[in-house]
Amino acid sequence: MREFKSYTVNFGPQHPAAHGVLRMVLEMEGETVRRADPHIGLLHRATEKLAESKPYNQSIGYMDRLDYVSMLCNEHAYVMAIEKLLGIEAPIRAQYIRVMFDEITRILNHLMWLGAHGLDVGAMTAFLYCFREREDLMDCYEAVSGARMHAAYYRPGGVYRDLPESMPKYEPSKFRSKKELELMNAARQGTMLDFIEDFTERFPGCVDEYETLLTENRIWRQRLVDVGVVSPERALQLGFSGPMLRGSGIEWDLRKKQPYDVYDRVEFDIPVGTNGDCYDRYLVRIEEMRQSNRIIKQCVDWLRHNPGPVMLEDHKVAPPSREEMKDDMESLIHHFKLFTEGYTTPPGEVYAAVEAPKGEFGCYMISDGANKPYRVKLRAPGFAHLSAMDEMARGHMLADVVAIIGTQDIVFGEIDR
C-alpha cells in the first residue's frame, strides 16, 4: 500500500462551522494542520461599486448588509464620512441615540458570536440563552425603524426619527396562555427608553448565566486555552483591531483613543487580554458586553432628561418633515430634490472609522464634487483577521480550526463586500 505524508481537506463552504461561505483548503498531516488557505469571494456583491453609482443618501441600506450582524455600526462609519465631507455635525440628541444603538448593536453581535462559537465547539445551551436576549434587542431595532435587522436608521445629519413612545407587543396566540402573554408584555407597557432601561437592569444577570455555563467549564477551557495564540507585536503587524487586538494585550479602542460622537462623554473601561489565545478573546468580548450595557444606561439617562431635535434643520441635506411638506411648497421641492438627485459634496477625501463589534470598520471616501462619491473604500476588520488564519491554525488539530474561526468572529458580508 502506498504511503502518503500529507493530504488536503476542503473545509466549507457548506460546513456548518464555516460561518457562511468560507472555503478553506487545509493541508493535513494526520490530524494536524500544516497549512490553511482561506478562499474568499463567494459572497461578493460589489457594494463599493454600487455606492459609487448612487447619490450619497441612497447607499445607507447597502451598509447594513455588509457585516449583517452589526448593522448600525456599518451605517455609522458611512454616515460619518458623508458628514465630514459636508462639514456638518448631528444634533447632540442624535449623537446620543447613535451611541446607544451602536452599543445595542455590539451586544447583538457578541450574543450572536457567543452562541455560534459555543455551538461550533459543542455547547448548545449558550446558543439558546443568547438568542433569548437578542430577541429583545431586535425589538428595539424594529420599534425605531420597522426592520429587525437592516434598519437604515442613521442619516447624514442625525437619525431618521426620534425614539418611539411605545414598544411592539406580543399578540394573543393559541400557543400562549393569558398569563404568559402578560408576563412577556410586562416590560413593553411604557416608552422605548423604559424598555431599554429594564433590559439593562436584567442583562448583567444574563451575562453571569453565560459565564456560569462556559467560563470555568472544563471542556470549554480545554478547547480554547492556548489555541490560536497571537503575540501583541504580531497582532499589530497583521493589522488586527477590536477584540482580536485587545485579546492579545494591546489597549486600543477607537471609542477612547479617537472618540467620535459622544463617546468622550460616557464612562467605560477597555477590557484587555494577557495571553492572546481564544480564551482571552472570549473573556474580552464577555466584558465588552458588560461595558456596552454600562454605556447604554448612561445614554438612556441622558436621553430621558434632554429632549431636542434629532436631525439637522438644513433642508439642503436633511429632508423636511411630512407635516411641513403638506403646507409648504419649498419643503416639497427640497424633499423632491433630495430624493431624486441628492446633494453634492465639496471635492476632497475623508476617512471615517468606528469601533465596530469586530474591530475598526472604516469608510474612505473620495468626492469629485458630484452628487455621488467618486470612490468608496470600506475597511473590514474581518479581512485582516481571516488573513491570519494560516498562521493561527498551523500546528493545531483539525478540531481547533473550528475554534479559531469562531474566535475571529467572521462574517463574510464585510469581507467579500
Swiss-Prot record:
One Pfam family per UniProt: Complex1_49kDa
UniProt GO molecular function: NAD binding; NADH:ubiquinone reductase (non-electrogenic) activity; quinone binding
Primary residence: membrane
InterPro entries assigned to the protein according to its UniProt record, in alphabetical order: NADH_Q_OxRdtase_suD (IPR001135), NADH_UbQ_OxRdtase_49kDa_CS (IPR014029), NDH1_su_D/H (IPR022885), NiFe-Hase_large (IPR029014)
Keyword list, A-Z: Cell inner membrane, Cell membrane, Membrane, NAD, Quinone, Translocase, Transport, Ubiquinone
Subcellular location field: Cell inner membrane
Annotated S-S bridges: none
An annotated GO cellular component: plasma membrane
Membrane topology label: Peripheral membrane protein
EC number: 7.1.1.-
Reactions it catalyzes: a quinone + NADH + 5 H(+)(in) = a quinol + NAD(+) + 4 H(+)(out)
SUPFAM superfamilies assigned: HydB/Nqo4-like
Keyword Membrane: yes
Spans traversing the lipid bilayer: none
Self-association and partners: NDH-1 is composed of 14 different subunits. Subunits NuoB, C, D, E, F, and G constitute the peripheral sector of the complex.
Recorded family membership: Belongs to the complex I 49 kDa subunit family.
HAMAP family the record matches: NDH1_NuoD
NCBIfam families recorded: NuoD, PRK06075.1
Its biological purpose: NDH-1 shuttles electrons from NADH, via FMN and iron-sulfur (Fe-S) centers, to quinones in the respiratory chain. The immediate electron acceptor for the enzyme in this species is believed to be ubiquinone. Couples the redox reaction to proton translocation (for every two electrons transferred, four hydrogen ions are translocated across the cytoplasmic membrane), and thus conserves the redox energy in a proton gradient.
Protein name in the entry: NADH-quinone oxidoreductase subunit D
Organism the protein comes from: Alkalilimnicola ehrlichii (strain ATCC BAA-1101 / DSM 17681 / MLHE-1)
Species lineage: Bacteria, Pseudomonadati, Pseudomonadota, Gammaproteobacteria, Chromatiales
